[in-house]
Structures are given as C-alpha cells and as structure tokens.
Amino acid sequence: MSSKKTDALLNWLITLTAIFGCSLTVIFFALSNIKELSIQEKIQFRNQALTTTAIVFLASTAMFNTYYAARRAQAMHKSAIASEKNLEIGLQNAKLNQDRLIAERFMGAIAQLGHEKVETRTGAIYALERVAQDFPQEHWTIMEILTAFVRENASIQHLKGEQQKPEYQGAIYSSRRRGGSRPTPQLEQNLHEEFPKIRTDIQAALTVIGRRNLLEDPKDQKLDLRNTDIRQADLLKTNLQQADLRGADLSGADLRGADLSGCDLSGAKLIRSILYETKLIKASLYGANLCWANLNRTNLSGANLRSANLSGASLRAANLQGANLYKANLQQATLKAANLSGAKLFLANLQGAKLGKANLQQTGLIGANLCGANLNGANLSGANLNAAKLHQTEVYFANLSEASLTEADLYQANLIGANLYRATFYQANLTQANLMGANFSQANLNDVKLEGTILTGAKNLELHQIREALGDRTTRLPDYIEAPTHWRQSS
C-alpha cells in the first residue's frame, strides 16, 4: 500500500472518529434538554456526554501517537538500512581506492627498481618499505621482491684459484704454527685482501629486510638470500632469523648485535666478519668459512659448526654450549673464557688455540688435535679427551677432574698444578710432561708412559698408582715415593 493511500485512510479514520465523538456529545446534550427529565438527570446526561467525548478523544490521541511512532520506527529502520548500504558501498569504494593506491605505488616502485641510476633504485626500495608498513597484507610479498632483487643483482661470483678455498685459507695459519714456515707473499696478500664495497641499492635492500616487522612474517617462510655476494654489508643489529644464507659471502660484513638465530649459513663465507654479540643460536654453519672472524661474546649455543673453518677466529667469552664442532678447524683461534660445555669437538683441529679459563666441562674432544694449545686455568672436568693430541700443550692449573684421557698423547705437555682428581689416563702418553704440583687423587695411571716425566711436588700420588704406570730412571718422582725396581733397572 502506498504512503498516499495510507495517509488518506488515516484522514478518513480521523474524520469518522471526530464525527462519532461529536454525534455522541450532541445526542447526550439533546437528551439532557428533554423537559420530562429532572435537573439532576439533565446534569448527569451532560457529564456523561463530556466524559464520553473525552474518552473518545483520548483514545484517538493514543491511537494516533501509536501509529505515528510505528511510522517513525519504520522510517528509522529504512534509514538505517540505507545508511548501512551506503557504508558498505563506501567501504567497497575505499577498498577499491586502497587497492588502486597500492597497485600504483607498488608498480611504480617496482618499475623503478630496474632504473639505471642507483639513486632511483634506492628510492624505490625505501618506497616499497613504506608500502609494506602502510599495507601489512603486502609485507611478505615486498620482502620476497627485495630478496629477489639482492639475489639477482648481487649473485655470488665463484672465485677462481686454490687460494680462495676455505681449506687453503686455513692452511695459512697451519704454516704459522710452531715449526711452520712463513707464508708466501701471495698468501700474505690474500690475508690482507680488501673486499669490494657493497652497492648502495643492495645495502638499502638489506637494511629494509633487516629492520622489517617480524610479526608480519608468515610462519614456515624464510628469507631467501642464498648464494649472494654481500661482502662488507652493514648488518648492524639486523634481524635475519631463520634466513636462508647458504653459500652467501658475508666476508668483512658488520653483524654486531644481529640476530641470526636458526639461520642456514651452510657453506657461507664470513672471513674477517664482525659478529660481536651476534645471536647464532641453533644456526647451521656447516662447512662455513669464519677465518679471522670476530665472534667475541657471540651466542652459538646449539649451533652446527661441523667442518667449519674458524682458524684465527676470536671467540672470547663466546657461548658454544652444546654446539657441534665435529672436524672443525680452530687453529690459532682464541677461545679464552668461552663456554664450550657439552660441545662436540670430535676430531677438531685446535692446534695453537687459546683456551685459557674456558669452560670445557663434559665436552667431547675425542681425537681432537690440541697440540701447542693453551688450556691454562680451563675447566675440563668430565671432558672426554680419549686419543686426543696434546703435544706441548699448556694446561697450567686446569681442572681435569673425572676427565677421560685414555690413549691421549700429552708428550711434553705442561700440567703444573692441574687437578687430576679421578682422571683416567689409561695407556696415555705423558712422556717428558711436567706435572709438578698436580693433584693425582684417585687418578688412573694404568699403563701410562711416564718416561722423563716430572712429578715432583705432586699431590695425593700413591705408590700403587706409580706401580701401574710405565716409567724409567728419568722419571722424577716426589720425595716420598721411591721408584719401582724395574724402573731403576730400565735403560
């Protein structure tokens, strides 16, 4: 029914109500004028007429108010529906405008990434960063674009020549160890080789990637920076958690305070890189080259450094707790006050390494090469040094309590004042070693070679321990122990 018809019907109802009310009033007033009626009856009829009229008009008023209230409610409902539709249309238009704006800014920035001028490319990178910040739904897409830009424009250049191989670089330090020859001029040149400066646009892309909002990163997605040449990159305090950097060259890069936890750096090069206080928790550095890198106070707990080259690297006060360093090269590395508790250093090369006051508690060093290393004041309690090589190693006042040195070679090692409580030296070689003032309480010296060994001033050394060992007349025993007869008779 149209609004005009509804209004006409309402007008008819109003008119009929008014006529009905007036008719009742007229009737009651007419009845009140009958001459046969008493004055009291006339007054009664008139009062009844007025009351009836009032009731009719009050009822009419209530009906009209109810009607108009319903009409107002209906109108407001229609208005709300219309407003909701307008709002929905407005939101759709806003989304369309936003999508158009994103597309324009997005495509404009991407188009400029291929510009010939580095300034334009750099500006495009920062424009993409702003898009990622303003429109979080595009965050990961932009990160993928930037990583692809780095991979495309800074791909690794495979260096030619044997001198570039990690094992060859490590050999430089090998030649410097005791008795080694001086490196050739060519090797010295490689040692001090200057790395090329990173391109401005590549640095900008890495900066944007490194300071992105991690909360917007999707789960199970990784930044792909494989096989990239980002030498001398400034990655100070950047966040590259879980990034894929396999085969990347970060030589000379500044990674101080960066977070590389969970990163895959297998086969990566970090020659002379600065990783001071860097987080590499549970990172994979399998076969990585970290020659001469600064890893002081770096957190490498649980990291995989299997076959990694750390020759000459500085790891002062570094955390390597539980790390895997199987067959790692740590020649001439500095590990003073480092935490290597529970680490696996099986067959690792630690020739000439400095491990003074390091924590090697419960560390696995089976077959490790520690010749010429410095372990003064180190904690090796419970460590496994079976078949380890410790030629001329300095172990002053070190803690070797309950350590296992079965078949270890300690020829000419210096263990002055060492704590050997309950240590096992079964079939170990201590020939010409210096154990002056060492604590031998409950140590196992069964079949240990003690020819020329210095044991003067040894503490808690008992005769039965000496009888189990293999010494000779050159063995220097404490004053309170007499050499066994067969020792004195040996040539």
Predicted regions and their residues:
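Tandem repeat scaffolds
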Residues: L215-S491
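Hydrophobic transmembrane alpha-helices
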Residues: I14-I43
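Positions within the helices of HEAT/ARM-like alpha-solenoid repeats
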Residues: T52, V56, H77, E119-R121, ...
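Membrane-proximal alpha-helical anchors
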Residues: L37-I145, H464
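Hydrophobic core/packing positions within alpha-helical solenoid repeats
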Residues: L128, I202, L206-I209
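Alpha-solenoid HEAT/Armadillo-like helical repeat scaffolds in large eukaryotic proteins
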Residues: G108-L113, V131, I145-I156, E188, ...
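Residue-level signature of the C-terminal ends
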Residues: V131-F135, F149, N153, G170, ...
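Juxtamembrane interface helix immediately N-terminal to a transmembrane segment
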Residues: M1-G21
